[in-house]
Amino acid sequence: MADAQDTYSYDAPSIFNFSSFHDDHNADSWFDQLTNAENIPPDQKPLSETSVNAEQNCKVEPGKITPSKEEVSKSTTHVCDVKSQTKRSARRMSKKHRQKILLKMKETHLEKETAQSEYPPCKKLKGSSTKDRQAPVIRGQPTSSHHGTTSPKPKAQLTMPATPTVLKRRNILAKSKSSEEQELEKMQALQKEMLENLKKNEHSMKVAISGAGQPVKNFIPVTKPVDFHFKTDDRLKRNANPPEGDGYKEVDFASVLRKPPTSPVQVTKGGHTVPKPFNLSKGKRKHEEASDFVSTAEQVVAFYRRTPARYHLRSRQKEMEGPSPVKMLKPKLTNPKTPLLQTKQRHRPTTCKSAAELEAEELDMIHQYKFKAQELDTRILEGGPVLPKKPSVKEPTKAIGFDLEIEKRIQQREKKDEVEEEAFSFHSRPCPSKILADVVGVPQKKLLPVTVPQSPAFALKNRVRIPAQEEKEEEVPVIKATRMPHYGVPFKPKLVEQKQVEACPFSFCERDKERQLQKEKRLDELRKEEVPKFKAQRLPQFDHISLPEKKVKMPTQQEPFQLEIDKRGATKLQRWQHQIKEELKQQKEMVVFKARPNTVVHQEPFVPKKESRSLTDSLSGSMIQEGFELATAKRAKERQEFEKCLAEMEAQKSLLEEETRKQREEEEREEINQLRQELVHKAQPIRKFKAVEVKASDVPLTVPASPNFSDRFKC
């Protein structure tokens, strides 16, 4: 950061006039100068003016480096002229001439390196392993005064690009130190620390010995400025020892990019390589000791014999003792001892029968079995046909229809419709004698009480009439006497006799015997009924013995295996043959000549374009600054666009918020107005109805008349 004097400037023409190619007649003068300079030996060559200018420009203050607008315009026009000359001459140069120019440029590079070794480097050379840098050549800058005003104008040369010092750090690891030097430095630092600690201890001893009552003032040391030490500077691995030979080396730039930088600490030591064996089969795990083989049967037996650890009592004394200091003695042979089991004293009754007992039981069963022969049926000897009884012919099943409830309901409806009305026949009844004696059927007229007139007291309090409670007459219950019972047969209750149930002995032997006899009789009847008829079979004819044909089995016939791989191979072969046929067909079709329409006549003629390449583009080792775009400018544009988008989004958001706020205010205003209208009480006018006009009835009063049922009242 301290190298603020190294500045970076680059002036490139913004407008290039291509018409100057044809106007310039001295375009090839630069190549003539280069060819003349090749004849001068390298020892007698003076320093180039560009190197002198570089030295002068490096010493100039940074404030004076910035050129004026006129100088920049002159320099741009000058660069345009030089570029036009190089571009025109590049077309006429041969290969030999180009090689000479390359050699010349390499020599100029070496001269610049030697001339500028005293000053701090500016740019890393492309393809070289050294870390030397060059100061930029500032165009249009006037030379220093001590060279004189009459000095000739320096010729325009190619500008060498250099990175700005802002993007670089100081070359801290210019020289790598060996391990011995590093150890010595560490020892010196430790010695210094020891000396400082001794001084502090002596000072504290003096203070302690001198008066302890007075307070000692702490001495605060002055802060010392310490330079910044970045960790990234230590990571930079640069080759401090430059290789021997100052020759210019051509290196492929693409391959160097991927190549890791050589570390300065690693120094290759001479000597033969010591071969070491490869431990390929060695595992990471520790070697496990091989245990004795135990079969699964033995493991199972041991598991069942072994008492689980949870049943063992743990003694605290043994746990506290720890491992025994005495060495374990060799194990001796075990003396077998009887376990003194208690199972011999236990005797349980055996429930299982022995083989002898089972055999004796079987013999008894055989002796008890008696063979009972059946009686001979006489009908067999008679030779009559003993036919089985014909089974009784059963009546054929009669189909019975389903009695569905819906059919019953339909039939009932039909029956109701079919019911005819009964013929009404008039039968006269005798006339009751009460009609002739008195009026019958008409109730007597009740006499109403006389109405007492009263004033209609509308304004009085007691105008509301209290309904008179009618006294209900209590109905006198009619007592009806019950009928007298019939005392013809007197009731005599029967006394319950006390009986004692006596248990009598009983047995089912007689009943079982009777049932057994009935069963035997029934079986005899069945046997007599179903006597089989004897039918003798014919004797076989031994004249001709007809044996069945011997079935001769066919031997197994071998068939080839039908493998899936053969099928796949066959399908693949067919596909391949089909593909070959199609390819041959396409080739034959392509061989057949078919003339295409002539479209070249109607197209525009080909016009070769001029090459806009410069001489330096064709040279492999040349370095020309191409147009570039700084990342800061790109980020600034992106940031500007992002801020613009943010501002638009904020504006939209504010508009939406304003609209919602206005809408909310309008809704609140409407609600308040509506509430006001609802809360204000408005008196309604008294309604006026038509007066009630009571009209007198026009119907005359009913005149009561007695019903004249009989003819005696008639005139």
Curated annotation (Swiss-Prot):
It comes from the Eukaryota. Residues 36-167, 260-291, 314-337 are annotated as: Disordered. The keyword Phosphoprotein applies. Residues 47-56, 141-152 have a biased composition (Polar residues). It is found in: Nucleus; Cytoplasm, Cytoskeleton, Spindle; Cytoplasm, Cytoskeleton, Spindle pole. Residues 104-115 have a biased composition (Basic and acidic residues). Its main location: nucleus. Phosphorylated during mitosis. Hyperphosphorylated upon assembly of microtubules. Associates with microtubules. Interacts with aurka and plk1. Interacts with kif15. This is Targeting protein for Xklp2-B. The gene is tpx2-b.
